[in-house]
Amino acid sequence: MTQANNAVYTDISAAQLVEEAIRRGEGELAANGSLVVRTGHRTGRSPVDRFIVEEPSTKDAIAWGNINRPFPADKFDALWARVEAFNNAQDHFISHVHVGSAEAYYLPVKMTTATAWQNLFGRCLFIEPEQYNPAGKDEWQVLNVANFECVPERDGTNSDGCVILNFAQKKVLIAGMRYAGEMKKAMFSVQNFLLPERDVLPMHCAANIGEAGDVTLFFGLSGTGKTTLSADESRYLIGDDEHGWGEGVVFNVEGGCYAKCIDLSEKNEPVIWKAIKFGAVLENVVLDEERVPNYADDSLTQNSRAAYPLEHVEKRSEKNLGGEPNAVIFLTCDLTGVLPPVSILNNEQAAYHFLSGYTALVGSTEMGSGGGIKSTFSTCFGAPFFPRPAGVYAELLIKRIKAFGSKVYLVNTGWTGGGYGVGKRFNIPTTRGVIAAIQSGALIGAETEHLDIINLDVPKAVPGVETNLLNPRNTWADKAAYDEAAKGLAKQFIENFKKFEVSDAIKAAGPQL
C-alpha cells in the first residue's frame, strides 16, 4: 500500500481507485454505486491493431495471418521504451495480480495503467491473490497507457493504438486504447498460447457447478448467452468467459466477469444485476438525470459492458475452480432458424462443431461491426484469442472429453420458425429449460430423432420445453423453405470446413448435402 512521491499508486484499494478516477474526471458514479466510464471512439476490441512479436519461441508455433499479425522485435523494444518513458512522466497506477486460479497454472502479472479506472477494471477481471506469486514464477508485465498516441510511420503500428504480445520478454503493451476489454483478452491470449504446452486446454467458455459438484461448460461467442446462462441462481459460478481444462480440474483464468449490459433486466439476469454495485465498472452505459443506468440505451454502443469481481456474485466457487465437466455445451446463435434448440453430439461431431464455431456476431465486441447481425464461423468459439493452429486445441478437447466421458451438446440460442427478421429468437426461459435438462442428466440416453442435411440428433422430449420446438422444421410454416434454408446453411458449413485437415470421420460428422 505505497504511494510514491512521483504519484505512482501501487496496490491501492478498489475504493481508492474509484476515488482517484472520480477526482481525475475519468468517470462518474451511478446510482447503483458503480463507476461509469466512456471509452471514446473505440467501444470494442480492435483486431487490426493486435500483434504478436515474431521471435524464435513464436515463429513456428503461431497461426500467423489476419488474426495473429507479426510484429518485429526491434520495433517492439523501441515502442515499449517510448511508451514507458511517456507513462513514467505522469501519474500512474500499478497492481499485482494473477491470471489463472489453479496454483500450477497461474501467471503473476504486474499491471501498470495510466488511468485509475483501467486499473480498477484489471482488479475486477484478474485475480487478486492472498499472496502474490508464492511460487516465485517469472513475472509478466502489462503496460496499458491509454493517452499515448502511436505514430504508425514511426512505431510500425496500424493506427494510433496497439495491443502487442511479446512472449520472449513476457510483456504486453497496450497503447492508445481506452476500451479496457483489450487488457483482459490480451492476457487470455497469452494463457491460450502457454497452456497447451502443459497439456491444458484453454477455453473461451463459462463454467458453473451444481450442488452435487457437477460442472457445466458453456462455449460461445459474445452475445450467445455464456454470461447469462452460466449466471444461474441454482448453481455456483466458476467464471463467465475464460477457463483452462487440465487433468482433474477446470479453473478460471480470471477473477471477475465482463457482462454485456444491453437490455439488462433484473428479471432475466438477477445475478448480473445484483453484481453491478460499488467496485464495479460500467463501460459506455448511459445514465439518466438521477444517475440510474438506462441499459436499453444503445446510443454509445450495443457493446455496453459491466466489469465486476467474482466476490460480487453470491453463489460462486470459492476456489474459482471445479472438477472436470459432466456437460460441455456449445452455444450457437443461428440466424437461419435451421438449427434445433438442442442436439446431442458424439465425439466426432464435437470436434467438427468446435472447429467450425458457427454462430452470429450479436452486438459484437469488435470495432466496426456496428449493431448489425451476421453469421460467422469462429474456430474454437473464439478465433481471435487462440494463437496456435486450431488443430492443437481441437485435439486437446477430444482428448479431455474421451478421458473424462463428458457429454457434449449443441444449443441454439438464436432463431426458430424462420430466419432473422421472419422467425423469433428463443427466449431465455426456453434456453434455461434446455440447460436445466442437460444438467439434470435427463438427455443422457434419451430417444432421439435424426435430422438429415444438418446431420444432427435431437431428443424427442426435453423436460420443461415445448415438444414442437425440438425439431426446427416443425416450427416453420413453409416446410420447403426450411429445407432450402437447411441446404444453404449446410453449404456454408462445408465451405468453411475445407480449410481443416482432419480425419474423414470428423469431416463426415458435419452437415451433408
From Swiss-Prot:
Q: Which GO terms describe its molecular function?
A: ATP binding; metal ion binding; phosphoenolpyruvate carboxykinase (ATP) activity
Q: Where does substrate bind?
A: 45, 179, 185, 305
Per UniProt, the enzyme's principal EC class comes to lyase
Tell me a GO cellular component: cytosol
Pfam annotation, one family: PEPCK_ATP
List the pathway annotation.
Answer: Carbohydrate biosynthesis; gluconeogenesis
Q: Where in the cell is it found?
A: Cytoplasm
Under InterPro entries, the record lists: PEP_carboxykinase_ATP (IPR001272), PEP_carboxykinase_C (IPR013035), PEP_carboxykinase_N (IPR008210), PEPCK_ATP_CS (IPR015994)
Enumerate the residues binding Mn(2+): 185, 204, 241
Record key words, sorted: ATP-binding, Cytoplasm, Decarboxylase, Gluconeogenesis, Lyase, Manganese, Metal-binding, Nucleotide-binding
Q: Give the EC number(s) listed in the UniProt record.
A: 4.1.1.49
Q: In terms of one coarse class, where is the protein primarily found?
A: cytoplasm
Q: Name one GO biological process term.
A: gluconeogenesis
Annotated signal sequence is: none
Which of this chain's residues are annotated to bind ATP? 185, 204, 220-228, 269, 305, 431
Q: Which CDD domains match?
A: PEPCK_ATP
**Catalysed reactions, as listed in the record:** oxaloacetate + ATP = phosphoenolpyruvate + ADP + CO2
Q: Which cofactor does it need?
A: Mn(2+)
Question: What note does UniProt attach to the cofactor annotation?
Answer: Binds 1 Mn(2+) ion per subunit.
User: Sorted alphabetically, which PANTHER family does this protein's record hold?
Assistant: PHOSPHOENOLPYRUVATE CARBOXYKINASE (ATP) (PTHR30031:SF0), PHOSPHOENOLPYRUVATE CARBOXYKINASE ATP (PTHR30031)
Cite the record's note on assembly: Monomer.
Function field: Involved in the gluconeogenesis. Catalyzes the conversion of oxaloacetate (OAA) to phosphoenolpyruvate (PEP) through direct phosphoryl transfer between the nucleoside triphosphate and OAA.
Instruction: Spell out the family assignment given in the record's similarity comment.
Output: Belongs to the phosphoenolpyruvate carboxykinase (ATP) family.
For this entry, the protein name equals: Phosphoenolpyruvate carboxykinase (ATP)
Organism of provenance: Pseudomonas aeruginosa (strain LESB58)
Species lineage? Bacteria, Pseudomonadati, Pseudomonadota, Gammaproteobacteria, Pseudomonadales
